[in-house]
């Protein structure tokens, strides 16, 4: 089966509605929690570790919901939203690879924030490098992620972990 290597905003919304990977399988969050506008490239080959990679983008709009509340007089995108975007992308990757179940973030190793996103910025880019992919009874991905704003790397997350679970009753 040939899988698409890029996804539009409409494709991502389809995934959020549960229409992409089938009932009971991974979904992306819907806006405003969907933290990217498109996946520009996804592959199960290549990347820094030869296990696959994902690239995605989000255009920054000065009226984005998070700027109004974080913080009204000093608007900045919360760092946790960038981190969540990386988990979202890793979960999407596992579903794209055919893994069944609902995605859940399981943690990360080192996380560094060395910059910020403000209403003056234009474009956030994400690059996820898969380190390990387990596609057995346990479906889990481990990856390193980088977030950049207007070409400058500002977030680094090592050992991001996401699993897919057929049942989340005991979670």
UniProtKB/Swiss-Prot annotation:
This is 3-hydroxydecanoyl-[acyl-carrier-protein] dehydratase. One of its GO terms (molecular function) is trans-2-decenoyl-acyl-carrier-protein isomerase activity. The lineage of its organism: Bacteria, Pseudomonadati, Pseudomonadota, Gammaproteobacteria, Chromatiales. Necessary for the introduction of cis unsaturation into fatty acids. Catalyzes the dehydration of (3R)-3-hydroxydecanoyl-ACP to E-(2)-decenoyl-ACP and then its isomerization to Z-(3)-decenoyl-ACP. Can catalyze the dehydratase reaction for beta-hydroxyacyl-ACPs with saturated chain lengths up to 16:0, being most active on intermediate chain length. The keyword Oxidoreductase does not apply. One of its GO terms (cellular component) is cytoplasm. It is found in: Cytoplasm. It catalyses: a (3R)-hydroxyacyl-[ACP] = a (2E)-enoyl-[ACP] + H2O; (3R)-hydroxydecanoyl-[ACP] = (2E)-decenoyl-[ACP] + H2O; (2E)-decenoyl-[ACP] = (3Z)-decenoyl-[ACP]. Pathway: Lipid metabolism; fatty acid biosynthesis. CDD domains: FabA. The keyword Cell cycle does not apply. Its EC number is 4.2.1.59, 5.3.3.14. The active site is at residue 70. Belongs to the thioester dehydratase family. FabA subfamily.
